[in-house]
Amino acid sequence: MPRKPKAAATPACKPAAPASTPAFWLFKSEPDSFSWEQQKARGKKGEAWEGVRNFLARSNMKAMRLGDRGFFYHSNVGKEIVGIVEVCALAHPDASDATGVWKCVDVRALADMPKPVSLVAVKANRKLANMVLVRSSRLSVQPVTPAEWAEVCRMGGLDPASI
């Protein structure tokens, strides 16, 4: 049986043609493996969000559009939203997956969260009671509603209209 070809190199982030209405997401990362500081160090080029092995998270990434925004969440250590990222390359093969089943998007850092928003604070806010982070906290790439986006930005000291 022939071997599968290697996954293509990660596409470079393209200048985003802003979607008419961007969607919002939350990306979880263990800071010991890949931190917000490392994400920021990638600059405008961004970084492939590789290694996700959950079908719902994969579907979420396949639904993303250029210019969509996301929260960068430190899981396990810190458990807080620390920054804002932008989707800068659409779903493509995950180079860390030899099977070709898994996809990833590329994201680049846009802004620090002036006041990191802890999981405890999110859970304590009644406006966020239905947020996926509260209801299904293990999902590594999850949708965020526009109302949740605005509320978390407010909690973190950001004007959602400026992001």
Predicted regions mapped to residue ranges:
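Structured loops at beta-to-helix junctions and adjacent beta-edge loops in soluble globular domains
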Residues: 28-30, 110, 144
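Short, acidic Gly/Pro/Ser/Thr-rich loop/turn segments
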Residues: 32-34, 114, 151
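Short, charged, solvent-exposed linker or helix-capping segments at domain edges/interfaces
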Residues: 38, 116-122, 153-155
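Short, charged beta-turn/beta-strand-edge "cap" motif at the junction between a beta-strand
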Residues: 73-79
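Compositionally biased, charged N-terminal/linker segments
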Residues: 1-66, 159-162
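Aromatic- and Lys/Arg-enriched surface recognition patch
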Residues: 82-142
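Charged phosphate-binding loop/patch that engages nucleotide di/tri-phosphates or the phosphate backbone
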Residues: 146-163
